[in-house]
């Protein structure tokens, strides 16, 4: 009897260990993460649903930011020239595959953040254009097309990348071969991490990449995004990266100057004063102060989806003119 009780206790202990420490097996995102992330206290999300009512095919859009995120901004895409109009028109008509290519650094390479956006957009506009797949950190992020109408969302991230990383003939050819209708560019974290960062050089690097992409993909439209924020320094003396605010500003100014769309995630989640504090307060930032937990990346993916759908609904509500 005593031995049976002991065995039962051991089973319970082992079970609890594996429930609390799923990192004992597998990989999930860009760094060794569990296949099922550790359980965090659920984020308190606002319950209100934002829905636009008008003629045309509008998509229901839910708020994504936790209530306790401080000094946030409206989660919208800035696009004063309506440069994304051709992409949204194709989404609305859906006469064939509509292709998105999302390029960027390790935040994109981890697949969690862009994959959430992809799955939600597939739910909105149809997943018939791609074969069912299971994307993990060990797989690539490319979708496999069926030829049917629907959304196709390709993910191309490189750990440690800056926008310069993609200014090679090989990478430009790979992007162009996917025939994107929209390219999303998510860089800035690694630019900001360099102590030798210079804003004029950064602007030139963005311009070089976009010039190469425009030449290779003349019918494509572009969406720039700003980084989510990060810390720098050793763990005991870590501080909020002071260069991120400049990096985000350069990306915004470049987009404005060249009539391009920009999603300013950095400002949306709290900007200079609170972005990093908001991530940390909700246990969404990993111990390195740069990368995020799976739940943190899922929130970013939901935010990007929300911003895209808000912009899409606006175009539909105004007659796509």
Regions from the language model: what does each represent?
Residues 1-38, 321:
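Bacterial Sec-dependent N-terminal signal peptides
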Residues 184-188, 206-210, 214, 221-226, ...:
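Conserved, well-ordered alpha-helix/loop/beta-strand core segments that scaffold catalytic motifs
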Residues 27, 227-321:
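Catalytic His-Asp segment of secreted/periplasmic serine-dependent ester chemistry enzymes
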Residues 36, 110-112, 192-199, 231-236, ...:
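Extracytoplasmic/secreted cell-surface and envelope-processing proteins
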Residues 78-91, 140, 164-176, 204-212, ...:
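Alpha-helical scaffolding within the catalytic cores
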Residues 30-80, 136, 140-141, 282-321:
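Conserved catalytic region of serine esterases and O-acyltransferases that act on ester linkages
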Residues 111, 115-119, 173, 200, ...:
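Solvent-exposed, polar/charged alpha-helical surfaces in well-ordered, non-transmembrane soluble domains
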Residues 99-102, 107-204, 208:
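Conserved SGNH/GDSL esterase-like catalytic core that processes O-acyl groups on lipids
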